[in-house]
Amino acid sequence: MPILDIRPYHLRAHIAWLDDSGERPHIAIANGPDTVFPPAWKDQDMVVFNIDSEAVQYCNVDADGITFMARFQGQPFEVRAPLNAIQWVASQNGAIKIPFPQLA
């Protein structure tokens, strides 16, 4: 049996830990061919999203990456990003910033 990628487990754990600690988790996502950003940000190299449970809906982390629904300029939009696009997870104020491991 192959070893599973540990990154989705780390990401879910970091998000839950920040949330349980009373922090609002934020995630930095690098733009790339498999990343889906709101149209206003499609030209940005990297975007930081508030992924607190009050800010997004249907946040899902799995072996394919992260997806969540959020409102941008009043319109719902599904953000999608592969695991390799995730740069870091942090608290809102930046006091806690956890770099996310990349695979070659």
Residue ranges and their predicted role:
Residues 1-104:
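Eukaryotic intrinsically disordered, low-complexity regulatory linkers and tails enriched in Ser/Thr/Pro
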